[in-house]
């Protein structure tokens, strides 16, 4: 039997600020617990060394404004690079599955990045997925986001991608950051039904979440047949998390992971650094490695303390049924959207970066393609934290784009170089892996 | 004058060393059933060469503990484990007489679940009824709070005074409960036999009228006194490879990146020296299938040596066993040594015999003798190089937990290969040439192991953990615990001073204070503890050591 790959990168020399939840201490007790348990010594585990992601790995996914280097520090490249190490270990058959216990986190980072939102600058999982597609020709991907906060960054990145099934369950956005992830958010016109949100009521327990796993998420994965299953393994649904209000346990997390059986899990949030993380991470490692976790529990765990209310169970059941219908009808809905839309669908979007108080305004243009999910153009403007204002135009040709979308996308880039109404132009051709930045005022094109 | 004796699995080597020169050497077959006799025979053959001069120090390595563990002849010992909540109990498959008890402490030393007195009473009664006279106790996070281990220790002392007990918090202050439990168990089960052996050695030394210091070589390349050794006899495992590595270092230039290649009869041991410091096994010495908290050099053993015999079965094969000595030393079959002897025209022993036996095998294989030699030399060099490079990769791929460590990613840049052992002269220059680095061979290479034993200094590593909000500190080894005088504003500098002071105290106690000034910090960690949204104190982890090195009398060898 192949081992489970673990990359533990606690970034003991990185923090957003000394008392911020994202501080050096965050994975200290997790380290103490997993080292003291000696689980890394077991033959079922293979531990890996991190590496730095390359600038291109980031630029393949994000439009970092003005450059990747300006938006991140080395810690981000190590965190993203660690996910890539796990991806390589899995794809090259060295491990049966892999878990990147890394920070800084990433799932709130969107396609365009002007700064840090929700503790995230760049999206580790999505960078990994585009790397998997580029290097290994992976086509269909499922992401299950089990962080208590809606994975709005990952959702935005794959909103128009019919080959990525993004499922997020989280505490209801009316009660928690980032205030999104409602049931009606089902994906763009050509990828409708491949974004699935399950907003859960505060205090939802193991029973409620495991019901959603069994009755909705597993059947969806069975039906969608992804080439790879990724888990955005946030740990803040835990009953002791200081930033959220759910009632999930360490054993519940282990059980969830064991049923979900992700190929690669990547740590996201989780800020109960002393009373949850050490035990949840142990539980996840044990579940992934197939080690019996029935002897694992938090010091203060009392199974009778958290009982799912019949009323909440009813709510979850109703939600599960409704989302299953949305998912099942997705092909019809998409066909319908193709008929009734014009050549392009255009929409405005405002994005708030809570960590750095940045307001970004976007105009999005999606090509309504008859053969693929269409390419996307984003016009974005924002005052960054430095006070500098950027007005940029970004063209993203997705990995599974058809010939015509590739050609039109590249032509749009050339066209914009002539028209020049922006500070910076970006071309991201994920099919050809061609990544370019055009500085309009200086007339300089950089090929990454 | 200094004496070093390395008891190996097959042979025991001894040297008498004085002012940069080896005065006498002795080589004897090792008698596994009576190591003491082997040791004393070698000692007695060396002593006449000393004449009337005083022997200041005798250091020996021994395979006693290794043999005890391999043959299971240690004392029957019960292991009581308090594993708390985590891995299933069957993950701790350390020994036959194992008992699990309730009682849990967390990583901050908070008691989560108290000891169940009745359960402990029952376990102790069962142990006593089985006639077991020795007990090892290991609790998870006992390095952060040893209260439960101490309670069991007191209970045993009160109720079963004839049962001896070792507790894990005194053995090591490091994280990793299974390693701490295994180390405590192995310590407990070997201590009785070790003390008997140590007493015999002491007596023999006295009988010979010597008043030399007697030290034992440890797996970490340092020594400890015979007295100290009885606290942690397990640390004497794998001292043979440590002796060779330190011997190689003693003979060669310091501060280089080196591979020490010790080529024996049927195995070759590979160790790395990085900037003059030997590389340790990151998970500690491995005894059987268990990792331990015993500091040991990272040694990669390859089943290939000078006496490895050659065969033909459709292709040329270098076997992992011997059928006797090399043909050039009167053996009946061609060996690796013979192939190098002919290929490089080394003229070792009776080279004609090498050529003749190789010719017979070549005829069988239907090839020229020169082609046979070429193939064998290639196989040997490639197998050694791939093992050496695997060690480089392993070192480069050690986990890293800080951004700094990843950004400044290390890469092993080899300067030289140091050859040790009788067959090294033939093989090592060829390996080094293929890797495009220098080879280093010394006239003393064949006895570098015993020389290494003679001249290495004592080592000691002390680890301090401080938790200021909990007003707690612990020091290992020895299981020292205490509270802080001023918990408020403790800074890293004070924690380092504290660790240095404990090292100094232990040095005094072990008669090695002259080395205390050569200590260095190998770990300095500090974390802010946040409660709510404000800082409530700090956690420090500090490690200070007297690293492996050489006694001040040793100023190198005269060439």
Regions found by a protein language model. Name each.
Chain B
Residues 1-559:
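N-terminally biased helix-coil "hinge/interface" segments that flank
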């Amino acid at each position: 039997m192949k081992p489970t790959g673990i990359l533990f990168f606690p970034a003991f020399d990185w923090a957003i600020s000394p008392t911020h939840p994202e501080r050096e201490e965050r994975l200290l007790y997790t380290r103490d617990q997993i080292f003291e348990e000696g689980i890394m010594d077991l033959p079922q585990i293979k531990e890996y060394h991190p590496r730095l992601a390359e600038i291109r790995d980031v630029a393949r996914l994000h439009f970092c404004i003005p450059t990747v280097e300006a938006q991140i520090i080395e810690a981000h490249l190590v965190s993203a690079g660690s996910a890539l190490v796990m991806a390589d270990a899995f794809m090259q058959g060295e491990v049966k599955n892999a878990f990147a216990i890394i920070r800084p986190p990433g799932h709130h980072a969107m396609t365009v990045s002007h700064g840090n939102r929700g503790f995230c600058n760049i999206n580790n999982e999505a960078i990994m997925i585009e790397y998997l597609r580029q290097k290994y020709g992976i086509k269909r991907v499922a992401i299950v986001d089990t962080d208590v906060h809606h994975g709005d960054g990952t959702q935005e990145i794959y909103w128009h991608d019919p080959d990525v099934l993004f499922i997020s369950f989280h505490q209801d956005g009316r009660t928690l950051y980032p205030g999104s992830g409602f049931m009606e958010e089902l994906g763009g016109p050509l990828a409708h039904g491949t974004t699935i949100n399950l907003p859960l009521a505060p205090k939802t327990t193991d029973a409620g979440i495991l019901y959603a796993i069994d009755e909705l998420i597993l059947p969806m994965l069975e039906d969608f047949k992804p080439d790879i299953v990724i888990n955005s393994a946030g740990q803040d649904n835990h009953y002791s998390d200081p930033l959220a209000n759910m009632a999930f346990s360490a054993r519940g997390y282990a059980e969830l992971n064991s049923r979900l059986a992700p190929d690669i899990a990547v740590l996201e949030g989780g800020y109960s650094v002393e009373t949850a993380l050490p035990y949840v991470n142990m539980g996840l490692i044990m579940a992934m490695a197939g080690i019996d976790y029935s002897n694992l529990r938090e010091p203060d765990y009392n199974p009778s303390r958290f009982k799912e209310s019949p009323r909440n169970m009813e709510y979850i059941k109703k939600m599960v049924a409704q989302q299953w219908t949305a998912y099942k009808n997705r092909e019809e809905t998409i066909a319908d959207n193709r008929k009734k839309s014009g050549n392009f669908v255009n929409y405005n979007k405002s994005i708030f970066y809570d960590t750095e108080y940045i307001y970004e305004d976007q105009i999005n243009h999606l090509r309504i393609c008859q053969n693929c999910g269409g390419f996307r153009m984003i016009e974005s403007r924002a005052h960054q934290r430095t006070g500098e204002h950027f007005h940029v135009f970004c063209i993203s040709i997705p990995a599974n784009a058809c010939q015509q979308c590739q050609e039109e996308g590249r032509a749009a880039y050339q066209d914009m170089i002539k028209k020049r109404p922006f500070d910076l132009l970006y071309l991201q051709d994920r099919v050809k892996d061609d990544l370019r930045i055009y500085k309009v005022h200086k007339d300089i094109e950089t090929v990454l | 004058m200094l004496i070093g004796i390395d008891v190996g699995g097959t042979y025991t080597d001894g040297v008498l060393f004085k002012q940069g020169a080896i005065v006498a050497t002795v080589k004897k077959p090792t008698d596994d059933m009576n190591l003491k006799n082997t040791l004393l025979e070698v000692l007695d053959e060396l002593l006449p060469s000393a004449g009337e001069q005083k022997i200041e120090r005798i250091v020996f390595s021994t395979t006693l503990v290794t043999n005890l563990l391999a043959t299971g002849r240690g004392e029957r010992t019960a292991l009581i484990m308090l594993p708390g909540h985590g891995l299933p109990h069957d993950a701790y498959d350390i020994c036959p007489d194992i008992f699990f008890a309730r009682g849990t402490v967390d990583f901050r030393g908070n008691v989560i679940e108290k000891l169940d007195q009745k359960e402990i009473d029952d376990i102790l009664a069962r142990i006593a009824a089985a006639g077991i006279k020795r007990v090892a106790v290991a609790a998870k996070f006992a390095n952060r709070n040893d209260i439960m281990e101490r309670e069991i220790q007191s209970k045993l002392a009160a109720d079963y005074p004839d049962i001896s007990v070792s507790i894990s918090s005194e053995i090591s202050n490091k994280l990793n409960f299974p390693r701490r439990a295994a180390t405590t168990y192995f310590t407990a089960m070997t201590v009785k036999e070790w003390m008997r052996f140590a007493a015999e050695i002491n007596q023999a030394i006295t009988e010979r009228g010597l008043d030399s210091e007697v030290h034992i070589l440890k797996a970490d390349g340092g020594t400890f006194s015979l007295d100290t050794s009885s606290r942690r006899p397990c640390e004497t495992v794998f001292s043979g490879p440590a002796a060779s590595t330190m011997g190689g270092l003693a003979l060669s230039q310091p501060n280089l990146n080196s591979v020490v290649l010790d080529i024996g009869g049927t195995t070759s041991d590979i160790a790395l020296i990085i900037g003059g410091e030997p590389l340790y096994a990151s998970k500690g010495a491995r005894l059987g299938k268990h990792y331990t908290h015993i500091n040991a050099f990272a040694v990669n053993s390859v089943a290939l040596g000078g006496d490895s015999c050659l065969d033909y079965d459709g292709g040329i094969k270098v076997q992992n066993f011997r059928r006797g000595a090399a043909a050039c030393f009167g053996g009946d079959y061609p060996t690796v040594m013979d192939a190098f002897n002919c290929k490089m025209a080394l003229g070792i022993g009776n080279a004609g015999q090498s050529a003749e036996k190789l010719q017979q095998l070549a005829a069988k294989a239907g090839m020229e003798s020169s082609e046979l030699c070429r193939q064998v030399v290639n196989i040997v060099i490639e197998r050694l190089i791939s093992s050496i490079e695997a060690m480089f990769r392993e070192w480069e791929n050690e986990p890293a937990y800080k951004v700094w460590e990843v950004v400044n990613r290390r890469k092993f840049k080899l300067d030289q290969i140091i050859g040790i052992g009788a067959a090294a002269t033939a093989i090592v220059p060829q390996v080094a040439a293929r890797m495009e680095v220098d080879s280093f061979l010394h006239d003393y290479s064949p006895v570098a192991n015993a020389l290494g034993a003679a001249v290495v200094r004592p080592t000691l590593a002390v680890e301090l953990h401080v938790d200021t909000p909990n007003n707690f500190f612990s020091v290992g080894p020895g299981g020292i615990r205490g509270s802080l005088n001023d918990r408020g504003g403790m800074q890293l500098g004070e924690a380092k001073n504290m660790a240095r002071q404990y090292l100094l105290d232990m040095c005094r106690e072990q008669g090695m204070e002259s080395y205390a000034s050569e200590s260095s910090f190998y770990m300095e960690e500090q974390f802010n503890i946040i409660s709510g949204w404000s800082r409530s104190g700090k956690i420090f982890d500090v490690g200070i050591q007297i690293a492996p090195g050489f006694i001040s009398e040793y100023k190198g060898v005269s060439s």
